[in-house]
Amino acid sequence: MNLLLLLAVLCLGTALATPKFDQTFSAEWHQWKSTHRRLYGTNEEEWRRAIWEKNMRMIQLHNGEYSNGQHGFSMEMNAFGDMTNEEFRQVVNGYRHQKHKKGRLFQEPLMLKIPKSVDWREKGCVTPVKNQGQCGSCWAFSASGCLEGQMFLKTGKLISLSEQNLVDCSHAQGNQGCNGGLMDFAFQYIKENGGLDSEESYPYEAKDGSCKYRAEFAVANDTGFVDIPQQEKALMKAVATVGPISVAMDASHPSLQFYSSGIYYEPNCSSKNLDHGVLLVGYGYEGTDSNKNKYWLVKNSWGSEWGMEGYIKIAKDRDNHCGLATAASYPVVN
């Protein structure tokens, strides 16, 4: 082959392989990298920026539709911006739904007027939003948050509990640390172990480790757990009368990855395919009509910069949207 022709072919191949970036995004890209402390090699930077730009365009399109009234929630760029949705799901969604020993069944209270809105944060039984990092330990944060609330309601003291204790020590009950687990398995571990350490004594590391539980630092315990029937009405009664509740949801969608504010409704959200454990801390409605714009108030474990300072409102009474009522439970504290 002619040398000049060969060079031309090679140059053409290189040009086709190199992503073309939207220069109008350059300032935002560099600011995003600085904010989230991203350092890449040359080849990885090209790949990550291409992903970031694709996500940014998706967010802009959605928010344009939101402004026109086509959606009830907005989206924004966040720390997950350089991740594909597949990467995102593999890293942070660690709920592993499977058959397991059931707890006691929730007995719905009779002849009780249920309030139209509840927010357990106002009662002082919810700790600040935490961040699970790149570890599939959502189940541990959901379980610890639920037990934190029950212990507060019993003792009047709000103590942050150790997720790392659960990540490292509950393998015998069926959990797999950063590779996923179940809140009910965590409650079972706490019962069998005789306690759970405080966050202060056993801090979170966002990685698997050997069990370092020390009984002298245990500040919480449970005697089992209660499973709630798979209906939103029963879940509403449990939230109103029991406290924050551990729930699982379908968190697999880009719309949730970049959720910002408003009432989340994703047409493709499943009520059965659950992959993320969260903490349900209340419910309510937007506007003046309590029969419209209803939502569940959910505490996530992706840090306070995600969503509404770490929280999300999910559509309520819309056919168990995203599955919040499918696998709800709470620990029993005597």
Swiss-Prot record:
Maturation and modification: During export along the endocytic pathway, pro-CTSL undergoes several proteolytic cleavages to generate the CTSL single-chain and two-chain mature forms, composed of a heavy chain linked to a light chain by disulfide bonds. Autocleavage; produces the single-chain CTSL after cleavage of the propeptide. The cleavage can be intermolecular.
Binding site for Zn(2+) 5: D250, H253
GO CC aspect terms: apical plasma membrane; chromaffin granule; collagen-containing extracellular matrix; cytoplasm; cytoplasmic vesicle; external side of plasma membrane; extracellular space; lysosome
UniProt-annotated binding residues for Zn(2+) 4: E205
Residues that coordinate or bind Zn(2+) 2: E163, E199
Main localization, broad class: other
CDD domains: Peptidase_C1A (cd02248)
Membrane topology: Peripheral membrane protein
Signal peptide: 1-17
EC numbers, comma separated: 3.4.22.15
Reaction equation(s) it catalyzes: Specificity close to that of papain. As compared to cathepsin B, cathepsin L exhibits higher activity toward protein substrates, but has little activity on Z-Arg-Arg-NHMec, and no peptidyl-dipeptidase activity
Binding site for Zn(2+) 7: D275
Binding positions for Zn(2+) 3 per the UniProt entry: D184, D227
GO biological process: antigen processing and presentation of peptide antigen; autophagic cell death; CD4-positive, alpha-beta T cell lineage commitment; cellular response to starvation; collagen catabolic process; decidualization; elastin catabolic process; enkephalin processing
Keyword Zinc (UniProt): yes
Residue span(s) of the pro-peptide: 18-113, 289-290
Site location (Cleavage): F106, Q107, E108, L112, K113, I114
Compartment(s): Lysosome; Apical cell membrane; Secreted, Extracellular space; Secreted
Subunit-level organization: Dimer of a heavy and a light chain linked by disulfide bonds. Interacts with Long isoform of CD74/Ii chain; the interaction stabilizes the conformation of mature CTSL.
Family: Belongs to the peptidase C1 family.
Function: Thiol protease important for the overall degradation of proteins in lysosomes. Involved in the solubilization of cross-linked TG/thyroglobulin and in the subsequent release of thyroid hormone thyroxine (T4) by limited proteolysis of TG/thyroglobulin in the thyroid follicle lumen. In neuroendocrine chromaffin cells secretory vesicles, catalyzes the prohormone proenkephalin processing to the active enkephalin peptide neurotransmitter.
Protein name per Swiss-Prot or TrEMBL: Procathepsin L
Native organism: Mus musculus (Mouse)
